[in-house]
């Protein structure tokens, strides 16, 4: 009924219109409301609501559930007329057809709601499974394929038989639905298959035209897996993997790619496909890859020294920053990133923009340009220090001044994102300062050290992490020369400084690349700034993939 559909749409629209008032009325989190809005605005959900309305409109009920008895009465009446009328004789013949009788029987069963399957016989001989398989248990499955075309199936040996181990999602066999995991392959085109999985794979790969398989069905009920999406944190090439059961069935991917996991039944090999589309393939499971990574020695260049953020930071830097070193040790001890589960969210504004990069690569310049470009939308924190203010300094303009004792107490309480000491004075960024900028309705722009991202990467701060990558050595030297000539900078960097910047940039990328949402090579400040602006605008118009822990 059109009215019901209209009522359904109006009700959903009313809920959407009132989502804005829910945080004040219920205390609901902003991210949860964004997720709820995305679900309710989904075309699939709206279609389901309409379908529900249609199904609720009219409940169809059978007129009667004893049509077989009715037909028998009709046949008795027709028996007297059949000799006199050819039409009556033809009707009697139709009503006695086996197919028509089966149709009526099925109708009566559905009408009387007799859906239960009879229980198995309690007297079944337990030795039945050891008896020869009856001929009617064997199935013949026909497949048409071209030579070299993959079926999308792998095999294992079980009890001397070749059994289907997995069916690749999206492959030919999965699309046809004729074979199932656990089916035993007996023959291919009339030839016994033996017990060599590789030989069977080669036989099926080279076959063309009509391929007839004789199988013993497993009758296993397939289960519907939940949708799982992951972001990959390593490169994988199945052609170079000696452990994969079938190299041709593997799925190649690079760090940063988004995959949909379609099957996790195997402890070592998952089935996945790229979210952009394409066929599914095998990838190493989290467990298998963790075992392999455990034997790889960690790059010593990435190990923090003495609690500082980066052992290569120049001694000339004003502040040698540290951040929550007790938590840092905990993070590093358990950090072995393989796959990160993510969820797709509708467009929304991030609360923080975190700029990561080597010293002197231009992070602070980009931060200042962004805030000057749109001060109503972007803001930043004011650092705290324990030193005494100079005569020209005012509280909150450049620094917030507190006593050393107060600052040390707050550091011990974990209230600082990062902190350090320079010339006997403490400097640091309070976490509450970030909360204050976010509460004012602005995006908090931070140019922090890489390890601080580990603290910020939560549902509270939902950061957008941008890595400002140093260009190559020659480009960096030319940029410094141009800055000196134009008067933008008065500091001439030595070759050692420039090489240190390039090397530090590479180390940060290797050690923290899995946290980055975007990487920009800063070979031209104006161009990099425009690219950063474009990326921030896209967040307001395009769906985003975020860690699943931010959503659930």
Curated annotation (Swiss-Prot):
InterPro entries: GK/Ca_channel_bsu, Guanylate_kin-like_dom, Guanylate_kinase_CS, L27_C, L27_dom, L27_dom_sf, MAGUK, MPP2_SH3
Keyword hit for Membrane: yes
Modified residues (Phosphothreonine): 117
Record keywords, A-Z: Cell projection, Cytoplasm, Cytoskeleton, Membrane, Phosphoprotein, SH3 domain, Synapse
All copies of domain L27, residue ranges: 8-59, 60-118
Stretches assigned to the PDZ domain: 140-219
Disulfide bridge partners, by residue number: none
MF terms in GO: PDZ domain binding; structural constituent of postsynaptic density; transmembrane transporter binding
Domain SH3 span(s) in chain numbering: 225-293
Domain Guanylate kinase-like: 350-537
Similarity comment: Belongs to the MAGUK family.
Role summary: Postsynaptic MAGUK scaffold protein that links CADM1 cell adhesion molecules to core components of the postsynaptic density. In CA1 pyramidal neurons, required for synaptic KCNN2-containing channel function and long-term potentiation expression. Seems to negatively regulate SRC function in epithelial cells.
PANTHER family: MEMBRANE-ASSOCIATED GUANYLATE KINASE MAGUK
Protein name, as recorded: MAGUK p55 subfamily member 2
Origin species: Rattus norvegicus (Rat)
